[in-house]
Structures are given as C-alpha cells and as structure tokens.
Amino acid sequence: MKIKIINNDFPVAKIGLDRITTLVSAKVHNCIYRPRLSIADGTAPRVCLYRAPPGYGKTVALAFEWLRHRTTGRPAVWISLRASSYSEFDICAEIIEQLEAFELVTFSHVREGVSKPTLLRDLASSLWQSTSSNEIETLICLDNINQGLGLPLLHALMEFMLETPKSIRFAVAGNTIKGFSRLKLAGAMQEHTEKDLAFSADEAVALVEAEAVLGVSEVQIEALVQEMEGWPVLIGFLLKCELPAKSISTVVEIDNYFNDEIFEALPERYRVFLVNSSLLDVVTPDGYNYVFKCVNAASCIKYLSTNYMLLRHVEGEPAQFTLHPVLRDFLQGIAWAENPAKRSYLLKRAAFWHWRRGEYQYAIRIALRANDCRWAVGMSEGIILDLSFRQGEIDTLRHWLSELPVKDLHKNPIVLICFAWVLYFSQQSARAEKLLKDLITPPDKKNKWQEKGWPQLVFAIGKATNDEMLLSEELCNKWISLFGDSNAVGKGAALTCLAFIFASEYRFAELEKVLAQAQAVNKFAKQDFAFGWLYVAKLQQALASGKMSWARQLITQARTDSGAQIMETAFTSKMLDALELESNYELCRLDTSEEKFSEILEFIANHGVTDVFFSVCRVVSAWRLGRNDLNGSIEILEWAKAYAAEKNLPRLEVMSQIEIYQRLLFQGVTYINTLQAFEDRKIFSGPHSAPLKARLLLVQSLALSRDQNFHLAAHRALLAIQQARKISAGQLEVRGLLYLAGAQAGGGTLKKAQHNIAYALEMAKQLQCFQTVLDEIRLIKRLIPTSCEVFAAVNLDQAIGAFSLPQMVEIRKSAENKAGDFLTLKQVSVLKLVKEGCSNKQIATKMYVTEDAIKWHMRKIFTILNVKSRTQAIIEAERQGVI
C-alpha cells in the first residue's frame, strides 16, 4: 500500500467554517494519511470508533476523515469534547450551528414559541424532518470521548447516533468504551483499537519520508516498529532524535510524554496501581491482591482497561493483563526510585505467587530479578519438563542454576539433568557430560527419571549441539526404541533433534518424513520449545537450498505462530534473529548496525550450534568485505576458527578456514597445496562431505583461475556444481556457475561463459539469493580481469529484477505445487519467457542454447503439466504457483 501525504489546501463551502477547517487542518500537519483507517462507504456500520491510549493518532485519523469528507463537497461537523464542562446543551448547540452553516437545517424561521432543540434526542427528531439532511451524507466527528463526560451524557450521545437519519454518519475518537454497548449490540459500530492504530513498518517509512529524516534505514525502522509495538508517538519521537542504544523509556521526550500525558492525568490511586503493576509479568486481580496485600485490584484493572486502555488483555487469557513494554519500563523506574528497599520483598512475593500456581516460567524470571535461587533445589520432574523441554528457558535456567552451590546441585538428579541440558545448549558439552556421567546407567524402575530415560535423552541430543551428528542420530533412534512409547515429551524432543540433523546434512527427503512425525508428537506433548526447533530445521533447509524468500516466509510464520511460542523466550527469539541474518543479507535488507551484529554475535558465542554460528560469521564477513574492510572480514572468520578449536567443532573450523583462504586470494595468496591437503581430513568423509567438498572446490577453482590455470579451474567448478546439485544446494550451485563462467571467460570460451552467467542469474532470481551474485561477480572480476568484459555485458539490475523487494515473487512450498518438484530450473525459466511472449528462437538466444533444446524443454513441460499448448502451460503453471 502506497502511503501519501494529504494536501491541506481544502475548499470551504461557508466562511463560518474557516475556523474549524484551520483547526482540523492543523491536526494533520506533518502527519501521514493511512487509508486503511478510513471509514468504509456503503453498507459499513454508521459509527466508526477510534479507541486507544494517548499517542496512537486517533485525532489525526478523525481529522483526515473530516477533511476527506469535505474535499468531496459533503458536509462535515467537528466537535471536540476535551473540556470537562461540556454539557448536552453545548454539544447540541454546536452541532446545530455547524449544520446551519451548510443549510442542512434551519431554525431561524420556525413558528413563534418554538425554540431550537437543546437535547440531542430532539435534534435527532428535527433532522428526520429536514429533507436536505436525509439526502446528503453528512459526517459528524466527535473527538476526545472520555469517561469524564459521565454516563448520562455518553448514553445521550449513543442514543443520538442510533436515532438520526441513515445519511448521517459518525466518527468518534477517545480512550473509553463506556456507553458504547448499545452500538456494539446493534452492529452499528466499526472499532479501530490500539492494535489497528499502531504503525506498520510501511507507515513508519512513510513518516520518515514525509519528515525528511536522514540516516535511518528501512531495516532500522522495521526493528523500531517491532520494539515499540507500533506506538506512533514513540516512533515519532525516536525518529527525530538519535536512536538510543539502551532503555528507550529514558529518552527525555518519551519520559516527559509518559509523565505529562498519561501518568499525571490519572487519579492518585490508579497511578499507584500502575506503578505496582509494572513489577508483574502479567497482572491479574488475585495475583496483584496477593503481592501487594490489598483487595481493590479488580476495580482498578476494569477502570484502566475500560477508560484508558493502559492495561491490555493477554491473547487467549481474558483474565490476564499486561502493560506496553516501554510504558512498563517507565513505571518500573518510578517504582524503584520511590521504594528501592521493597524491591526484593515484592519480587519474591510475585515469584511465589506464580510458583504456587505452577507457573514456573514466570516464577523463575521474577526470582532471578530478585536474586533468589533457593527454590531450584526443590524442582520436581514436572517442573523440569515444563521449564527445560516444553518452555525452553535456556538463558533463564543457565543463570539460575549457575548460582546454586555444587552440593545442592548434586542432591537432586532432576536438577542435574536440567542443568546438563542447559549446558549442552550453551556450548559447554564437556561440563554437561561430566554432570551426566554418573546418571547414564541402566534404567532403574525405582527412579522415575531413570525409567523414562532422561539422562540418555539429554546425552543424545547434546551430541547434536556439539556437532557430533552421526552419534547423535544413532543415540536418538536408540532412545526412541527404548523409551519413546512411555515418554511422549522425550520422543518429541528426539524426533525434533533428528529433524535438525537431517536439515544440517542436506537430507531433505528424510527431513520431510521426520517433520511430520515430530509435529504430531510435539502437539500431543505440548512441546512449545520443540516447535521452535522444528522451524529452525525448516529454516536450515531453506537457507541450505538457497531459497531466501521461503526462508523469509518461514521466519514470519515462526514469529506469529502462537503454538511455537518462539518470541516467548530470549533463546528461541535470538536464534531466529541469527538465522534471519543470512536471508536479510541475500535480499539486500540487512540491518548493518554494529549494535545488531554485536547482539547476534554474543548470542552465537554462548549458544550457537555449528550451522548457525557459521551462517552468522560468513554473513558478517561478507558484509565487511563489501565495505572494503578485508581485515575485518578475515578477523570475524579467524574468531570463528578459534572458537571451533576451543569447542572441538572440526566442521566449523574447516568451513571458517575455507572462507579465510578465499579472502586471502585478494592478497595474492593461493595456498593451493594446503587446499588440496584439506580433502584428506576425516570430516570430508562424513555426512557433511558434499557441502564441504563443494565449498572447497569453489575456492580451489577461484585460486586456479587467479593463477590462470583456467582449464583445471573450470573442471573444479564443474565438480562443485555436481556436489551442490547432489544435495540441492542452490546457493552453492549459483556460485559454481559463476566461477565456471569466470574460468571459461578467462580461457576465451565466451559463449559458454555467457550461457552459464545467464543460467546463474536466472537461478539466483528464482532463489532470491541476490547478494551472492553481487559479491561473487565483484570477486571474479577482481581476480580474473579478462572476465570483466563478459560480466559487464550483463545488466544485473534488469537481470535480477533491480533487487526491489515489492517486485519479488515468493517461492512458496505448498502441497499443491506438484509441478515445481519436477520441472527443472531451466524449464521454469523457459516458461517465464513464454509468458513474456517470446518465441522459441528468442528464448534460445536469451538462454544461449539452440532452438531445438528449447523445443525439447517445451515438450517436457507439456508432459509434466499435462497440457497441449503454450497458453495452457502458462495458465497451469500460474495455478500451481510455479511461475
């Protein structure tokens, strides 16, 4: 949706309306028009209510509606009810005055003894008697509806809305729902709440453009919108000042806004309630009453949620409420400033409340804030399952259990198992295995934790986190056969681990099968944490295949999937951020702030499994190289290599070293003998041999081309392409095709080079690994100067689609898309050119092949799609989502 700025030069029908037009126009100055908030025409409800806390643009939306109505020549009334002294008489008189200006009603020639209506119900009756008001659609805007008006006046307004002619419509802005129940019941009201009024990323970008804010990228804006949950006024403040690195609530403008517009506007008792509520993760009447030893929580919650919308319902939990996170930070600052001595005491009461109710996730988080870790020694099996396996509280448990004395830790095997699980996911496998050493014994039916095989399961999955995939797969399958029937939670975890292993090893057919099993078991066992890891496995498949738009789609699904609860814990949300880095880089939308990089690098240093660790480091290295920071590019890879050596992760070490060798080519160093010796390493004969060999062959090809050994370089590139195709690694295949083209151009076989460049570009366009193409072509042109001419002949922007995200076609992986599984990349490319109206001869020229080859491809396409003509082929391919 394109956002546009409304012109404020509006025609005015009557001179008496100049004042109102000026007033309303001022309200939209430097604001953006959001069409999605407009009042729908036709059969839509007659009343549109904009209801949200301060700063959500309610009045702005209302003003735009008034102006939109006036620009079409239709009458519009504007009433602001901010003054607490407003009476029904005042409102009635103001409406009449404005309607008379439009000659919709007239009371100047009524018979003697009859006065103008002073009550809204009488005005409604008068409007029915007016011919003009029944014919012309009129909009009445009521701004600042609030609980201070009192129920009698609110009810009178609602009755007026219901009893006026249908040609009169209403737009209302305020922060209360009081008095609107009849309108809701009658189906006469369309409501835009806080969620609707929040800025989308596109709208925030439009605001930046409207106010000519410089130095803020779209990715930064998107992150800001996500962090602010779209609160327009906060986003506006932050865009006008330097974006803070720490707490946003400490920004002076935001602090002042919260204090003046929200905090000081509340009665004292509700200010106290809000400050206290900021200490709780979720606010419930019983929980608040227990923690703060009072009895009035229910009435305060009702008042603040109904009249100010400052407390929001937790989705799916109507009895639970939360505060906006930035407002909560502001209120917590007040709480600790006013009463720092009570901090620990109140937090412990809150933690105990959740603990007593079995809400251990909340209890642990609050207990950590209170620096109280004593409860860990009393954890039962149920709690360990909930926290470790179902909830995935890795970060929280690591901090908590690390504080326990060793003697207390060893008193409870369940706590020990839990800690080992956490350590494995924190890349501390040696320490984890030391804890499990005495627990991995033959099952003892007297010990429930042994009977269900918890130590063996943690050990099996832990091996995968340490990149020992073969052993982990063997142990997981063995565990499922021994314990799977009696331990659903454990079985779900083991199947999820297998899914991750298969994704890492490019075993995509096996991955599809185990994903179906894992999803079914995890759903039955309520395994929220495992669902997050299943998304990670799918993401690994998408990234390994090079399908970046599919990866992007999966990330969006993961973040919005309430069943997976990925955003509920820091561990899984940061894992998603780390995986997102590669897709954002390829789609040319990377957040390049060092702060963002630092956060992700810190996370992978503590929790990064090999595939995630390498993905992040490779992207950061490539980005730095693109900025001509060769030393910085190598530095991050050297860090990854040193980390791998420290943690005994040979695959990570080898992949990092291969990338380092590629960077060293810029300095004229080839290490060709060392590269050949790499193939003798044990890791090259394991399950990851194909992608490792492909990466090594690519660097060898580049090194040979640099030494002008073009024949052997082309041979190495072909071998890399074969390895990539064997495992469906599209991104590696694109690189191989470009390296092959570079070697062919260097050797003088230009036509073959052109053919492979065209093929690589078409493949990259479909996969949407755009940055790979840009990076590799820049590298090839620098190392093989004779290839510059053939690459210069390619219009990259046109070939790849100008890298414009809105123009990108999503590559969706759906059950219906059967043909996409059988049509080759070349055949899909042929179909796209057919759709553009190209003849077989034109297609052959563009793809650097013979016309007979195109005819052969068309026959295959007809067979696979079961069609008889080119037109039918296009229709069927579009229906199945192939093109």
From Swiss-Prot:
Source organism superkingdom: Bacteria
Lineage of source species: Bacteria, Pseudomonadati, Pseudomonadota, Gammaproteobacteria, Pseudomonadales
Q: Which InterPro entries would you find in this protein's record?
A: Sig_transdc_resp-reg_C-effctor, Tscrpt_reg_LuxR_C, WH-like_DNA-bd_sf
The pathway entry for this protein reads as:
Hydrocarbon metabolism; alkane degradation
Q: What is this protein called?
A: HTH-type transcriptional regulator AlkS
Q: GO biological process: what's one of them?
A: regulation of DNA-templated transcription
Q: What does the protein in this record do?
A: May act as a transcriptional regulator of AlkB.
A single GO molecular function, which one? DNA binding
Which residue range or ranges hold the HTH luxR-type domain?
A: 816-881
UniProt keyword annotations, A-Z: DNA-binding, Transcription, Transcription regulation
Look up the DNA-binding region in the UniProt entry and give its residue ranges.
Answer: 840-859
